Structures are given as structure tokens and as C-alpha cells.
Amino acid sequence: MSSASYLQRAEAHPSPVASKLLKLMHEKKTNLCASLDVTTTSELLKLVDTLGPYICLLKTHVDILSDFSFENTVKPLKEMAAKHNFLIFEDRKFADIGNTVKLQYTSGVYKIAEWADITNAHGVTGQGIVTGLKQGAEETTNEPRGLLMLAELSSKGSLAHGEYTKGTVDIAKSDKDFVIGFIAQKDMGGRDEGFDWLIMTPGVGLDDKGDALGQQYRTVDEVFSTGTDIIIVGRGLFAKGRDPKTEGERYRKAGWDAYLKRIGN
């Protein structure tokens, strides 16, 4: 795992979007990604405005919004990202052949490539998925875009481990500029070959150990000790009975302290 600071990594990173993210993490002293699975735009925007000061990244699932529109959802989200200085990660989990994912990324109702700084994909269909998504990004926008590969998941019984994970890492090696890292539970190596992958870890909780649908939680210190760079937190920030502002600062501080401990500060 990396013992370099976020700023050191930002200055040397080959990906413009990864460099931008690492830099704002350093500036805001946060490695918290808020995963906000709500079903209306008003709920989403309210939570984003409250949590914005504490996060480096917002993770969305726009296909669960019952009232999604560019004018009323994407435009204010982008304005809040500028106001609070965070990036947007649409958790689309693409998993088809290259031409199909390119169309899913650029077209349809959501036109993800136009507004999401980062998206992600499964490795199950092979290297073509990276090529297709990169082409889609290049043909849609001049803004920097990045892709995360799903190497490991936090759900009980996940098949994403062992040879599957190794194969996904091999796919990531095909594009140093566009593939910026992984959704994973631990460090994925690569530094000896010149890669500096960002590791983003879901299933992080300071209080809960799991849920009835197979989610398994690990503590902030645990995930940083095995190589994470960014913690993805959802219900821990806004579930019933929790104050998003209080929890946002609590997770921000826990993540930042764990990062400082790892780099020896």
C-alpha cells in the first residue's frame, strides 16, 4: 500500500481526474465518499448540501431517482460540487461489451459521461469494456474522466475474489490514464510497474457490523490498514436517527486520522 501523501501522489499521477481528486482530498483533509441512495432529487440535493463540506466524492445511483432530469438533478449537483469542492462518481457498474457500454455511458436518459467525473465497471466482459468507456468519454467531453474497476465487493457471498480479482487487475493495466483504481477491500499492488491506483472501499461503518441483505461492514482503521485510500459510507451518514452533519464530520475525522497514521504523520 502507498505510504506517500495524497499531495505527493497528486503531483505525480498520470490521470488528470485522479490528480484533481487527490489534490482536493489534501486541501479539504477528507477521504470520505458519501453514498447517497435516496429516491428523489430533493432528498439527494438536501443531503449533498449538508454533507458537501466533509466529502471528497459523491457516489450516486441516478437510476433510482424517480424524478431525474438534467435541469433539476444534474445541474444543481454540478453547482454543489463546485461550491463544496468534491467530485461526482456515478456507481453504474457497467458490465457489457465495449460498444454497448459506450452507448450506455454516453446516451439514453442519463448521459453519464457528460457529468460524472468517475464511473465504474466489472471486468467480466474483458478489456473491451475499458476501451468502449474511454472512447465514450473522449467523444463526449473535454473534461477529465476516470474509471474504477470492481475488483472486490463488500457483500456476503460475493464471487469477486481470487482469479476474478487478478483478471480484473490485469484489465486495469491496459490503460494507465483512464483506469484510476479499484473498488476493493485491500491494496491491489501495481506500484512496482508504475501504477498508482486509488483504492475505494465500501462497507465501512463506525457502528454497524452488517444488514439483513448481506452487507458486511469493516471499521475505518481496518480498511486503511489493508490499503484503502477513500472510504465509501452510505447509511452510516444519514440513516434514521442520524444527523448527517454530525456523522459527516465524524467519518471525515476518522478517515483522515487513519490516513495520517498510515503515512506516519
UniProtKB/Swiss-Prot annotation:
Substrate binds at residues 37, 59-61, 91-100, 217, 235. The keyword Lyase applies. The keyword rRNA-binding does not apply. Pfam families: OMPdecase. GO terms for molecular function: orotidine-5'-phosphate decarboxylase activity. Keywords: Decarboxylase, Lyase, Pyrimidine biosynthesis. CDD domains: OMP_decarboxylase_like (cd04725). InterPro entries: Aldolase_TIM, OMPdecase, OMPdecase_AS, OMPdeCOase_dom, RibuloseP-bd_barrel. Its EC number is 4.1.1.23. Pathway: Pyrimidine metabolism; UMP biosynthesis via de novo pathway; UMP from orotate: step 2/2. NCBIfam families: pyrF. Belongs to the OMP decarboxylase family. PANTHER family: OROTIDINE 5'-PHOSPHATE DECARBOXYLASE (PTHR32119:SF2). This is Orotidine 5'-phosphate decarboxylase.
